[in-house]
Structure formats: structure tokens, C-alpha cells
A protein has these predicted regions:
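Pan-zinc metallopeptidase signature
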Residues: 123-124, 282
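Zinc-dependent metallopeptidase catalytic helix centered on the HExxH motif
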Residues: 190-277
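Acidic/histidine-rich, surface-exposed loop or edge segments in extracytoplasmic proteins
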Residues: 128-154, 211
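Aromatic, loop-rich ligand-recognition surfaces of beta-strand-rich domains
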Residues: 3-71, 81-123
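Extracellular/periplasmic catalytic domains that process cell-envelope and extracellular macromolecules
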Residues: 91-94, 128-130, 178-181, 198-203, ...
Length: 282
């Protein structure tokens, strides 16, 4: 069976999913493209990782009859729920249609959150980004929040590295720009009242995230927790990569210094799409 123009795959909302079959699934995207697609993203859903696509082939066609392999991926693993895998296309062309052939690693039903195509090569200028090492630690493994976090994030190292680059992409033009040399991110899940906090300066950054806040955020849904966790992480990672104002005191002694630091972090969080505008305070 072939599915055509599945609306849930192009709405930019990974909570609305394509649910396929246990074997190879074929999905055709037929909006009659006029400009070559240069990269695409596949998103995991909120379902268990066993339902994620693990291998896929993207094909292009000029007439809907003859198909050419455009990109092929095997042994793929999503680092979290609602997570993208970005795939550049090596030899783009004026294909009018695309077909995705995908399947899971085992014999489980395939579920995909989104498939989004771009007329830009979204990897350009960032291939040489220097990813920091990650030291991930759970100080309160017995808490409900720690267990919920594990349901959301399957590979914390890759998850944190992904967000480090996303922050840099907003703050800078290319990976070759001068930026703070963040070599290691120490990320800790901790049982305390609060949300999150960053300490230290490059090359070593320390971020803690409250398991109690995780529990609270997950009360509504796993997607709400995902939204909050990414938003908080964007904010804290900006503090790792942003430059500080000069000649106006310090974070604790000058309100303009504080406003610059925190305002930039919130601005990047908003730009990334993970800022709940309904919670804004005047």
C-alpha cells in the first residue's frame, strides 16, 4: 500500500502522526515541487522508540512513474521523542514528487511525527561545528521525574549536543565565527525546588535540571514536557555561548548587564519556538 500526501506529516506538529504498518511503508509527497529539495527532516513521534523509522530511502520522480534514489539511511536512532534527524541531499534535482520508503528496526508498527522538506541545505556552514563533550548524570534516579525524563530522552549525550549546535546557529552566522570554546557540558538531573540553573564558564559548563519541575511539566502531557525541556535547555545553553557586556559591571551588580544576559537567553528560546507566550509577565 502507498499513502499519498498524509496531512499529519506536513503540519509541523509531531504530536499528529502517520501510523503505518509493520513492514515497509511507502509514502508519496506530491505537492508538485518547483524548486529542488536540498534537505529534509524526519521527526520521531511521542510513541515508544520501537515505532521509530530506523531505515529509509527517499526517492524522487519527475513523472510519478519512474523513481530515483535521492537519499538512503540505515541504522538511524532518534535521541528523544519529537526529535528531528536532518538529512542533506547530495544531488538535488527538480523532482516533482518524492516517495519515502521506511520501516522500523524490528517488526513493530511504523509511526512518524513529521517529514519536512526544505529548499535550502540546512547543514551548510555548520558541518564544522565543534560539539562539546557531555557528562550526563542523574543524582536522583529514584525520583519519578528521572524516570519521566528517560521516557522523553533516550540518548542525553546526542540530545545535548544537538541543542548546543541549534543555539549556536541562532547566535552566530556560521560555525567559523568566533564563539566561546565550550568543551564540556556537565548536565545533571537533581531533586530540588526550582527549574534549572547554569554555572561555570567555558570551557566547562554546568547545568542542573529539576526532577520536580520535570514531574510538574509532564502532568499535562509528554509533549508539554518536551516543549518545556527544550525551552529551558535553549535558555541555559545561550548562557554558555553568549558574550558578556563590557564595562558595565557584572551580572549581580548591574541591572543592564543582567537584562542583557537573561534577555538574550529568553530571546533565543522564543526564536527557537519553545517559549510559551501565555506565561509572559509585563
Amino acid at each position: 500500500n502507498i499513502s499519498v500526501n498524509v496531512p499529519e506529516l506536513s503540519d509541523g506538529d509531531p504530536t499528529t502522526c502517520y501510523t503505518g504498518t509493520r513492514k515497509l511503508n511507502r509514502i508519496v509527497f506530491d505537492p508538485q515541487y518547483s524548486i529542488p529539495v536540498q534537505s529534509y527532516k524526519i521527526y520521531s513521534s511521542g510513541e515508544s522508540p520501537v515505532h521509530d523509522p530506523a531505515s529509509w530511502v527517499l526517492k524522487g520522480s519527475y513523472d510519478g512513474k519512474n523513481w530515483v534514489v535521492v537519499d538512503e539511511r540505515n541504522d538511524q536512532r532518534f535521541c528523544s521523542r519529537y526529535q528531528e534527524i536532518l538529512c542533506p541531499i547530495t544531488n538535488p534535482s527538480n523532482y516533482k514528487q518524492y516517495m519515502l520508503e521506511a520501516e522500523t528496526a524490528g517488526s513493530d508498527t511504523l509511526v512518524i511525527g513529521d517529514v519536512l522538506f526544505s529548499e535550502k541545505n540546512l547543514v551548510t556552514d555548520w558541518e564544522d561545528f565543534r560539539y562539546p563533550a557531555v557528562d550526563f548524570e542523574v543524582l536522583a534516579p529514584e525520583t519519578k521525574g528521572a524516570a519521566i525524563y528517560a521516557d522523553l530522552v533516550q540518548d542525553p549525550d546526542t540530545y545535548l549536543k544537538y541543542h548546543a549546535r541549534k543555539v549556536a546557529e541562532i547566535l552566530f552566522y556560521t560555525a567559523k565565527d568566533t564563539m566561546n570554546d565550550v568543551q564540556t557540558i556537565h548536565y545533571t538531573l537533581k531533586d530540588y525546588d526550582g527549574v534549572s540553573a547554569k554555572s561555570g564558564n567555558p570551557p566547562a559548563i554546568y547545568i542542573e535540571y529539576s526532577t520536580r519541575h520535570i514531574e510538574k511539566s509532564a502532568n499535562e502531557s509528554l509533549y508539554k514536557l518536551d516543549f518545556e525541556t527544550r525551552g529551558v535547555l535553549y535558555h541555559e545553553l545561550v548562557h554558555a555561548y553568549q558574550f558578556e557586556p563590557k564595562g558595565i559591571g557584572s551580572y549581580s551588580t548591574n541591572k543592564e548587564f543582567w537584562a542583557c544576559i537573561e534577555g538574550m537567553a529568553d530571546a533565543v528560546r522564543a526564536e527557537s519556538g519553545f517559549f510559551d507566550m501565555s506565561t509572559r509577565k509585563p
